[in-house]
Structures are given as structure tokens and as C-alpha cells.
UniProtKB/Swiss-Prot annotation:
GO terms for cellular component: cytoplasm. Belongs to the transaldolase family. Type 3A subfamily. This is Fructose-6-phosphate aldolase. Catalyzes the reversible formation of fructose 6-phosphate from dihydroxyacetone and D-glyceraldehyde 3-phosphate via an aldolization reaction. InterPro entries: Aldolase_TIM, F6P_aldolase, TAL/FSA, Transaldolase_3B/F6P_aldolase, Transaldolase_AS, TSA/FSA_arc/bac. Pfam families: TAL_FSA. The gene is fsa. The lineage of its organism: Bacteria, Pseudomonadati, Pseudomonadota, Gammaproteobacteria, Enterobacterales. PROSITE patterns: TRANSALDOLASE_1, TRANSALDOLASE_2. It is an enzyme of class 4 (lyase). It catalyses: beta-D-fructose 6-phosphate = dihydroxyacetone + D-glyceraldehyde 3-phosphate. GO terms for molecular function: fructose 6-phosphate aldolase activity. It is found in: Cytoplasm.
Length: 220
């Protein structure tokens, strides 16, 4: 299983990398824009934060296949081994096919249906990123869509994997993992929610109080 953080906040990546067993960091144009840093400045800093073995994801901005391929090559030259995120449009599918031939690893992003995700995988994307909460927000069933996509990839594109994205709660992320997803990416607030469980803190305080009442200190 691969766990990613969905952010361009270098300080938070450095902090959480000491806590979570993260495989890397995913970004998108909105996330990079929120950082107020040039993508060419922030990507090397993020790569340094996750280490050489960590995988970094960044997205193209062009709307046409030719431009996507050119931008993907530029990203790959700047950060060797980067996974290039390509929106799964008609032009995006063409770009994914071309980049597969170039040996550049891609992720099909902005996936709102299982059929759309399957096409990205068949075109050559290693990762496919369904938008779970955004599907829910549009009146759909994000988890069911992920379940369908996971089954389709297992049967028809086993070399590709679902990297589920767009979460508002830890429950959504866990449901994707229960559906068989091999990778998820968490926004910082959801990652923090997984750590902040009041009942855990209450239990620890009870252990400490019982120990102190018995032995007069908190030493082992």
C-alpha cells in the first residue's frame, strides 16, 4: 500500500514524514498556487523533504496533448522519476499514450467515473486518481465508483493502480482501502484527523493517573 500527502506545504511534509510512513507527495495546480511559490522552486524542496526514495507528483497545465507532453518532459527533466499528472480528457488520453512510449510515468487525474479511469489505465497511466468527495458532492457515490474502478483495473489493466484522492474524512479513505485500493493521497486536514482522536488521549491520561497514584511518578 502507498500512502501519499496531498500538499505543497514543505514544512508540514517534513513534520508528517517523521510520523506517517508516506511514499511521497501529490500536488496539483491549485495546491501549488496556494503555496505562493513557483512550481520550479517548490518541487525540489518537496523532493528533498520526502527523500530520494519518495515519489513526487505534479500536473501539467496545457489543454492539448502536444503541450501536455512538452510540459511532462520538462517536469521529468527537472525532477527525474516524477510522476506526471494528466487530466483524463480526450487530449489527456492521447498524451498519456505518447508519454508511455517516452517512458515517462503518468497518473490519470480528475477521474469522475470508473469508465474514465479505465480508459486512462488502458492508455498507459500507472496510476488513476478518482475524486471521491467531489463525486459525492455532485450527488454521486464516490466509494462505489472507486469499487467499480478497482474491479475493472484488476480484470483489465492489472499494471495500473487506483490512487484515490479528494477526501474530507478518514472514513472515506478507509473505505477506499477496504475496496482494495493500493494507494491513497490525504490532504493535511484528513491526515491530522487520523491522529487526533480524543478517546486515545483520554485513555493515556487514565494510564498515567493510575500509574502515578500507585508509584508516585511517571517513570517506568
Amino acid at each position: 500500500m502507498e500512502l501519499y500527502l496531498d500538499t505543497a506545504n514543505v514544512a508540514e511534509v517534513e513534520r508528517l514524514a517523521h510520523i506517517f510512513p508516506i511514499a511521497g507527495v501529490t500536488t496539483n495546480p491549485s495546491i501549488v498556487a496556494a503555496s505562493k511559490e513557483s512550481i520550479w522552486d517548490v518541487l525540489p524542496r518537496l523532493q528533498n523533504a520526502i527523500g530520494e526514495e519518495g515519489t513526487l507528483f505534479a500536473q501539467t497545465m496545457s489543454r492539448d496533448a502536444k503541450g501536455m507532453v512538452e510540459e511532462a518532459k520538462r517536469l521529468n527533466n527537472a525532477i527525474p522519476g516524477i510522476v506526471v499528472k494528466i487530466p483524463v480528457t480526450a487530449e489527456g488520453l492521447a498524451a498519456i499514450k505518447l508519454l508511455k512510449k517516452e517512458g515517462i510515468v503518468t497518473l490519470g487525474t480528475a477521474v469522475y467515473s470508473a469508465s474514465q479511469g479505465l480508459l486512462a489505465a488502458l492508455a498507459g497511466a500507472k496510476y488513476v486518481a478518482p475524486y471521491v468527495n467531489r463525486v459525492d458532492a455532485q450527488g454521486g457515490d464516490g466509494i462505489r465508483m472507486v469499487q467499480e474502478l478497482q474491479t475493472l483495473l484488476e480484470h483489465h489493466a492489472p499494471d495500473s493502480m487506483v490512487l484515490a484522492a479528494s477526501f474530507k474524512t478518514p472514513r472515506q479513505a478507509l473505505d477506499c482501502l477496504l475496496a482494495g485500493c493500493q494507494a491513497i493521497t490525504l490532504p493535511l486536514d484528513v491526515a491530522q484527523q487520523m491522529l487526533n482522536t480524543p478517546a486515545v488521549e483520554s485513555a493515556i491520561e487514565k494510564f498515567e493517573q493510575d500509574w502515578k497514584n500507585a508509584f508516585g511518578n511517571l517513570n517506568l
